[in-house]
Amino acid sequence: MDRLLFGDNQFFGINHMSEEKARAQAMRFQRTEAIMEVLDEAYDAGIHTFMCTTHDRIASVAERVRAAPDRYGDFTFYPCMPYAHKYANAVTDHGMVGAIRHFLPDDGFLSTVLAGGKALATREVDGIARLLIDMEMKMFAGLRAPVVFIQNVFTDLLLGMGFTRAFRIFDDHIREKYGAEPAYITMNMPMLLDALEREGITRPIICSNINKIGFRMSGGFDAYLDALQSGRVRAVAMSVYASGAIPADEAIHWISELPGVESIVFGASSAANIRGTKALVDRYMGAPA
């Protein structure tokens, strides 16, 4: 993985410290052209990996990249699925079963499962999960996507429900069908790491909040440091600036000295902030091994 990954929170009005700034960003990035302008700034600064949700707007970005292979020859996507609001809206509009029908192909598969009762439905959970993953991955067809994440909303929901077998299904399918590395976003890295290991998933790629002041690091600051020092996890650090509470130089320097942190993901909407973070990561972390 590259040392520095570019995230997409800023494009969809997500800011953990300022609702006003979040609203302004949501307005600014209503057009795909505005998103592409910022992505071009990042790409030209040497940040070639875009860690993004499977929002419908990202499909438009993928189309732009696919249509210009000479311009975006090194552009890499790290899809993060599923986009939670898309499914929540479908459940609201169509109900739970209707939502599943909405996203699955219309080939009678779901009707067969439902007609077969609980036993058949239980056996077919794997098949439904794989079909939903494939639907999410469609927008990245023909594009470089070597790492695929489960979004934290779903990761932590599955973790809380104790349905950790879903992680095994995801892991196997991403490796077998897409030749990619499965990865996980969570708000509680120590708990998730233990759960993944119980499913036989070792040294997973986990993206979580990691910063000097413990901002939004559920599970305990010391537990994160213990996991990183153990060598059991390949970490992607997010919220390294703690939404602006830590000076940039101090934040990156601290992260660079942690074992087990392979990458940092950050979001920015100005060329100055993009280039500033890139310079700090180059200074303290260097090029990927």
State what each model feature region is.
Residues 85, 137, 141-146, 153-289:
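Beta/alpha (TIM)-barrel catalytic core signal, keyed to glycine-rich beta->alpha loops juxtaposed to Asp/Glu
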Residues 1-26, 90-121:
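N-terminal small/glycine-rich loop or linker at the start of catalytic domains
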Residues 75-88:
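A short, structured active-site edge motif that brings together acidic residues
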Residues 98-155:
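Active-site gating/metal-coordination segments in enzymes
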Residues 17-33, 113-132, 160, 241-246:
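Active-site mouth loops of central-metabolism enzymes
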Residues 1-3, 62-71, 131-143, 193-197:
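Short amphipathic alpha-helices and their capping/turn segments at secondary-structure boundaries
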